[in-house]
Amino acid sequence: MNHRLRYKVLSDEDVHFFVRAIGAENVAQTVVKKEKKKKKKKKKNEEETYTPDDNNDDGNGEDEILLKDMNADWQKKYFGKSKCALFPRTSEEVSKILRYCHENHIAVCPQGGNTGLVGGAVPVFDEVILSLKRMNSVLSIDDVTGVCVCEAGVVLEELDDALMRRGMCMPLDLGAKGKCQIGGNVSTNAGGLRLIKYGSLRGTVLGLEVVLADGTVLSSLLRENRKDNTGYDLKQLFIGAEGTLGVVTKIAIIAPRAPEARIVTIFACNTFQNVVELMVEMKRRLAENLSAVEFFDRESLKLTVETLPGAKDPFPYDEDAGCNEDILRTKIQFYVAMETTVNEKAMESRLRANLLNFARSVVIGDTRRSRGNFVRILPKFRNDDMRKRGKKIAQRFMISVNNKHANELWNLRERIPVALKYAGAVYKYDVSLPTIKMYELVERMRERFAVRGMDEEVKVLGYGHLGDGNLHLNISRKKGPCKDTLAVIEPFVYDYVTEHKGSVSAEHGLGAMKVQELWRGKDAEEVRLMQRVKNMFDPRGILNPHKMIPSSPSLTPSKL
């Protein structure tokens, strides 16, 4: 249905209601014209109304700047036209806002830290932006049960810091942790770097408080029990729903004990087959301590080293190191970053010894201590010597020697998205595939650009969460966006994923970018069922419209 026919255009009356409901200081808008003039002193018991200087002394100027920022995603790829952003401080205020919007057919776009990559947190048209950033309190941390209850606007890194002070940690780690909010993480079912150890948010979230489209506050879902086998687990409907069924306002989540020691190891491999074999060995022999397994290709490392200050290639070629020149001439193509942890500091030395033994068994050559780091050295071996030493699936490795060094090594993977911000126009795809097929998509994409003579202007990078089959495919074009570039990528990337029974969205969600691609992974009956659920929770469709449910003539209300 046409957006303008279905939803009301925001009026002065609507803005005045929002001001009365949550206070002028919590409303940013460009609907009501504000003029610079002296603010009148409010009389006792006088009802609050919108006056020109309630937010600033320059009319709507500051609000315009704020709204411009909130109407765009961080990639500056998706843009909305909202003229009003609301900043409630309590669930009750969220309830007032949604009840009014429901009654008046006003579309709403919930927004957290706005770090998403598919346009899910910015308006498609002129929806009112509902920001949760001022609902940012950690309400309780239970030292006995390990359960943390907090509001949706708490920044992930700040929540993790609060837990660390109590000897616990968040079971979720993201590159955007310094800005993303836990409510947005839950609403997108964010995966992150340590899913292999702690599992997804569907398993670690115990309870939610959610405000429905009509203003109903579902506080009864905010349970802290690890076991509850009574009825349907309704909270699961809101995890990953991208704010289309209700607005998450509070979360109860399991906080595991924080590890006391962390060691990062980087391996270098020549083929992706070696990468997969290495991961299998890691899971088989180090499962108890394994907390993350990531991979990135040579193009990703090259971009990071060339772009970000302080980033260094962990394995620079050294002709004077006495290494086998034949091996050095074989370019390393892949890197595997492995994070291992132990809960007791006293166990760190044993873990380090285990890692060294593991590396010796999978990497060509011997190990020696060099310049304070455990570094892989490549002496000459005859073929029969290699056979005696067993199967070798990596070329080099480096083990971190302290926390600072661990962070430096881990940042080689974690900061790739930051480096990509300086690479021009970037086309990002977050997909899940059978592990053995992950990198084939990257290679096929490079071939498609090469046969069209576009491989010089376009770079294709591949990295991701090796432990759960999640590939981040990135195509960058220094000269900016181009229709010809997009035509090479789509729909091929989605066709490939569908052909290999993967998912077009592994962890980023559908947002505005992939909503129509939902048809690729689900049949019509499944999508119709999703639409029925949407209609039940949000019959007027005011919550994050044009997201999650694809448009199709077969999904009109009369056919549901």
Indicate where each model-derived feature is located.
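C-terminal substrate-recognition/cap domain of FAD-linked oxidoreductases
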Residues: 28-35, 46-53, 57-68, 267-268, ...
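Activity-critical C-terminal alpha-helical subdomain
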Residues: 216, 514-560
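FAD-binding subdomain of flavoenzyme oxidoreductases
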Residues: 137-294, 543, 559
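N-terminal flexible segment immediately upstream of the FAD-binding catalytic core
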Residues: 1-40, 45-99, 116-146, 175, ...
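Alpha-helix capping/hinge segments and adjacent helical runs
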Residues: 24, 498-510, 535, 539-543
